[in-house]
Amino acid sequence: MNLLDFFRERKKKETPAAIAKERLQIIVAHERGQRSEPDYLPALQKELVEVIRKYVNIDSDQVHVALEDQGSCSILELNITLPDR
């Protein structure tokens, strides 16, 4: 083994940090695939509550948002408990 082979071998080895990063990316991708709700659903619910609060006084726990997949389309269901007038 000459000096150049020593440096080439060193580049091929992955560092523990690179291995950990790759494993973490795989785990995160796997968990995202198994979740039933998309990433944007909590933010969407928060924004909807803010818009509704402009017109009606409600609590955030009175709003329920659900996303349902039905074959080729998705249905966004929004249930709001409105206060009595």
Curated annotation (Swiss-Prot):
A matching Pfam family: MinE
Keywords, sorted A to Z: Cell cycle, Cell division
Record GO biological process: cell division; regulation of division septum assembly
Gene3D superfamilies: Cell division topological specificity factor MinE (3.30.1070.10)
Highest taxon listed in the record's lineage: Bacteria
Similarity comment text for this entry: Belongs to the MinE family.
Function in brief: Prevents the cell division inhibition by proteins MinC and MinD at internal division sites while permitting inhibition at polar sites. This ensures cell division at the proper site by restricting the formation of a division septum at the midpoint of the long axis of the cell.
UniProt name for this protein: Cell division topological specificity factor
Annotated organism of origin: Stutzerimonas stutzeri (strain A1501) (Pseudomonas stutzeri)
Upper classification of the organism: Bacteria, Pseudomonadati, Pseudomonadota, Gammaproteobacteria, Pseudomonadales
